[in-house]
UniProtKB/Swiss-Prot annotation:
Accepts the ubiquitin from the E1 complex and catalyzes its covalent attachment to other proteins. Mediates the selective degradation of short-lived and abnormal proteins. Belongs to the ubiquitin-conjugating enzyme family. Pathway: Protein modification; protein ubiquitination. One of its GO terms (biological process) is endosperm development. This is Ubiquitin-conjugating enzyme E2 8. It catalyses: S-ubiquitinyl-[E1 ubiquitin-activating enzyme]-L-cysteine + [E2 ubiquitin-conjugating enzyme]-L-cysteine = [E1 ubiquitin-activating enzyme]-L-cysteine + S-ubiquitinyl-[E2 ubiquitin-conjugating enzyme]-L-cysteine. GO terms for cellular component: cytoplasm; nucleus. Residues 1-147 form the UBC core domain. Its EC number is 2.3.2.23. It is an enzyme of class 2 (transferase). The lineage of its organism: Eukaryota, Viridiplantae, Streptophyta, Embryophyta, Tracheophyta. It comes from the Eukaryota.
C-alpha cells in the first residue's frame, strides 16, 4: 500500500513539481527521499538552497512522513537537529495530504514563521521583539550554510 502511494506521489511530483521545490528517492530506497527547497524570495532565506530528508513510515499515508532539514536554518520552528514544528507533520496529518503539500507548507513556514508555537523559544523571542536582528541573523545563516 505505502510503496504504491509513494510511487504515485513521485510521478505526480515529477509531472507537476511545486514551485521552488523538488524531491525524489535517495538511491533505490522509495521510503527515503531527499528534497530541495529554495529559500522564498520575500524571506530572509532568499537565495538559499535547503536540503530536507523525508522518511516514509511503513504505514504511510496513515502516519505522517518524518521530514527534517539537513541544511542549518535560523528559524523559530526549526531546531538545530533540523526538526520542524509543523502541525501537518504531527497531529494535523491526514492521508489526503501529499509530499507536495508538505513541501509547500514548509516553504510558507519559511516566509511566515509561527513564533507562538516555537521549537526554539529564543529565536521566537527575537522574532517578536527584534525583527531586524532576526532577519539579519537568518540572512547571515542562509549565506553561510545554504549558499555553498
Amino acid at each position: 500500500m505505502a510503496s504504491k502511494r509513494i510511487l504515485k506521489e513521485l510521478k505526480d511530483l515529477q509531472k507537476d513539481p511545486p514551485t521552488s521545490c523538488s524531491a525524489g528517492p535517495v538511491a533505490e530506497d522509495m521510503f527515503h527521499w531527499q528534497a530541495t527547497i529554495m529559500g522564498p524570495a520575500e524571506s530572509p532565506y532568499s537565495g538559499g538552497v535547503f536540503l530536507v530528508t523525508i522518511h516514509f513510515p511503513p504505514d504511510y499515508p496513515f502516519k505522517p512522513p518524518k521530514v527534517a532539514f539537513r541544511t542549518k536554518v535560523f528559524h523559530p520552528n526549526i531546531n538545530s537537529n533540523g526538526s520542524i514544528c509543523l502541525d501537518i507533520l504531527k497531529e494535523q496529518w491526514s492521508p489526503a495530504l501529499t509530499i507536495s503539500k508538505v513541501l509547500l507548507s514548509i516553504c510558507s513556514l519559511l516566509t511566515d514563521p509561527n513564533p507562538d508555537d516555537p521549537l526554539v523559544p529564543e529565536i521566537a523571542h527575537m522574532y517578536k521583539t527584534d525583527r531586524a536582528k532576526y532577519e539579519a541573523t537568518a540572512r547571515n545563516w542562509t549565506q553561510k550554510y545554504a549558499m555553498g
